[in-house]
């Protein structure tokens, strides 16, 4: 599973870099883990050069059974007895006239707890789009709707890969609501007021001199997950951090051994992010081109028909970050800016930052985010 976690991690950072390049000021929030597993499910049915390109983009080595490893990984992350709420909707929708193989459908269920549903895009395009949106809404308990906007599918659509995630975690120890107040958040162009949460407690924190930034780890309940925030120093642009970022560096920068636990004054904005992506172009930029081209796509492990390309890869994610924790906020004497606290570390996320939600047991990046525009 270590190989797979590493492959998924590298893919996550590749995805983050491409998405962040597209629009420097846009908020980002996506689940690389679910994009990887959804694509790996499609990879089950890929052959020839299509399969080679997919395995290269996903960083999958030929060693061991990739699908078996994904099965183990997904079972661990999607456990039901957790303190965090993770609702996922992942399914492949195929044009019913494509004659999909039952062996492929069975493997989707076995390894990915996901299915292939056959619809008639040719006969009822709009009906299919609505059906897919309704299914996603139901699976995410209404948190995510409209994963496919009007015009995203057409009568010629053959394969649509849909993937949506809703995440709500509770902090190990909550932020006390009575200290949340409006504070300015500085973007490159302007200042906007955000609801800034405050907590004065022991956290693991570090400073990376290489890129001039602070690193803070905030544990979620039961410490199964944690949010790791990369916050550039006031004098450094977030783009500098993004440019330097690689999966290896992220592991080194956020290694618990290199962080020091101490009393920290933490200021973190309340967040509610809902982000949507059509990933076809992004994946083509990464080198996965044949899968999307009618004359080159080889999915003979999935269907008996030739010329069945992937038409759409839709991904949508929703996260809420607020004060809620599983334990009451400890009664701390809050001294925000008093002189006696000058020596104490301060982590004030009042300008753009990156954040990652880690699943510790599997060393997986569950989510990647950038908050740059309140």
From Swiss-Prot:
Chief localization: cytoplasm
Assigned keywords, A-Z: Cytoplasm, Protease inhibitor, Serine protease inhibitor
CDD domains: serpinB8_CAP-2 (cd19567)
Disulfide feature: none
MF-aspect GO terms: serine-type endopeptidase inhibitor activity
Any Pfam family hit: Serpin
InterPro entries registered for this protein in UniProt: Serpin_B9/Maspin, Serpin_CS, Serpin_dom, Serpin_fam, Serpin_sf, Serpin_sf_1, Serpin_sf_2
Gene Ontology terms: biological process: epithelial cell-cell adhesion
Protein name as it appears in the record: Serpin B8
Protein's organism: Mus musculus (Mouse)
Gene field: Serpinb8
């Amino acid at each position: 599973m270590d190989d797979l976690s590493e492959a998924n991690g590298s893919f996550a950072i590749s995805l983050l870099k491409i998405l962040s390049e597209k629009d420097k000021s846009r908020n980002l929030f996506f689940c690389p883990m679910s994009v990887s597993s959804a694509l790996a499910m499609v990879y089950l049915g890929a052959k020839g050069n299509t399969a080679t390109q997919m395995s290269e983009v996903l960083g999958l080595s030929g060693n061991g059974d990739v699908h078996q490893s994904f099965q183990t990984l997904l079972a661990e992350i999607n456990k039901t007895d957790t303190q965090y709420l993770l609702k996922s909707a992942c399914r492949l929708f195929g044009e019913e006239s494509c004659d999909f193989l039952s062996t492929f459908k069975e493997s989707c269920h076995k390894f990915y707890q996901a299915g292939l549903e056959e619809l008639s895009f040719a006969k009822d395009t709009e009906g299919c789009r609505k059906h897919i949106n309704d299914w996603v809404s139901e699976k995410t308990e209404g948190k995510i709707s409209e994963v496919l906007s009007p015009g995203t599918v057409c009568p010629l659509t053959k394969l649509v890969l849909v993937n949506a995630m809703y995440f709500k975690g509770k902090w190990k120890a909550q932020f006390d609501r009575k200290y949340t107040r409006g504070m300015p958040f500085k973007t490159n162009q302007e200042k906007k007021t955000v609801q800034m949460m405050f907590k004065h407690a022991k956290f693991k924190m570090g400073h990376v001199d290489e890129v001039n930034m602070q690193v803070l780890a905030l544990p979620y309940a039961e410490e199964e997950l944690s949010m790791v925030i990369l916050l550039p120093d006031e004098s450094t642009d977030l783009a500098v951090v993004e440019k330097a970022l690689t999966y290896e560096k992220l592991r080194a920068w956020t290694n618990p051994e290199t962080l020091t636990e101490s009393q920290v004054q933490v200021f973190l904005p309340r967040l509610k992010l809902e982000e949507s992506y059509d990933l076809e172009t992004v994946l083509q930029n990464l080198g996965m081109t044949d899968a999307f081209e009618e004359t080159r796509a080889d999915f003979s492990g999935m269907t008996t028909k030739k010329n069945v390309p992937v038409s759409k890869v839709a991904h949508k994610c929703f996260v809420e970050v607020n004060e809620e924790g599983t334990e009451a906020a400890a009664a701390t004497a809050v001294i925000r800016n008093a002189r006696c606290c000058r020596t104490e570390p301060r982590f004030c996320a009042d300008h753009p930052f990156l954040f990652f939600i880690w699943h510790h047991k599997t060393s997986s990046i569950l989510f990647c985010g950038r908050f740059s525009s309140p």
